[in-house]
């Protein structure tokens, strides 16, 4: 078929870049306050998460289990600009708010990559993966090796030296997706 037949007739051949990014200096005080509150709440959630991860690590250390524990921390996608608050008049912060970052902050959250979850750009898919395993993973190392969430099960099976079963309760299993990240973790 001709190329013009493959175009989305509603969006036209060339789609302008989506953006709601307005330079900070061009925002009015109310807009600045709203964006400031949004990022303050997000930062508070990150801080709360960090404190609680610290509590888990402290408990593992107190019980003498930290040295024998592999901890993986990752997320499945980059920041996401959802405008899906359940109540129009609720600002970010209360427990009944489902306020997410707007596109401008979501894009900043994925720096240095462009865009966010809904887009095909790296900001939506190129995310951090942090692994901590005392005595096994060399501290303060960084790799550019690509991995995916489907690599976690093969990694743990490899670490524990457990073969992936061919059957479960006499039913054949599907092939396991992913690859072990153990060689990457070990340097």
Task: State what each model feature region is.
Residues 1-175:
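Active-site-proximal cap/lid insertion segments
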Residues 176-187:
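Short, intrinsically disordered, charge-balanced linker/junction segments flanking boundaries
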